[in-house]
Amino acid sequence: PIYSEGEVLSAWLNEQAAEESLPRALYYNSISLHDGNQLAGRSRMNSLESYPARQQRLFADIAQFISQLEREGRNVMLVVVPEHGAALKGDKLQFAGLREIPSPAIVSVPAAVKFIGPDIKHSELYEVEKTVSYFALSELISNAMKWDAFSGAVNVQRLVDSLPSAAKVAENQDTVMMYIKGQPYIQLDGAEWTKYPDN
């Protein structure tokens, strides 16, 4: 069992501190918010009931990890990308907690990027409001390296202004959801396209 994401991340960071300060990357797949997880020491709850507590704990663990990274004094680009939404609310096509149909609420998730380092001088939050994809994240990472985002001289707005936008499209084995003229449409099992119903 994993009782704390913070403990896992902290242990990794402590291992790195003992080694030479070479560049490194960590890909960490958090499982705190996955369906079916249970909270240790508490009575059994379904995923929707336990989600608020699990979410709060995950954000606290991430905040703790950021504080540790800041104390290290190294240059770090922290990227947090949800796999998908949690379907906390149902709609006319599926119940809360189900993700069989890639609804707009499930596939529209925020991602976060934080630059940490001794020469980082910006602290403002910049929000990208246009629809972007994983390609935009890779572009952001590339630009950060190309323009040396850790020098303290790079305007973060410059990093995000040039990100490519993307059409909102999602697909699984039997279903396709995409936006047409600003409205979500869905195709189930290869049938006719229909507008995704409003709640």
Give the predicted meaning of each segment:
Residues 1-71, 88-91, 99-135:
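Catalytic-adjacent loop/helix segments of enzymes that bind and process anionic phosphate/sulfate esters
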Residues 14-15, 67-73, 92, 99-102, ...:
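Membrane-interface soluble catalytic domains
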Residues 80-81:
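Generic enzyme active-site microenvironment
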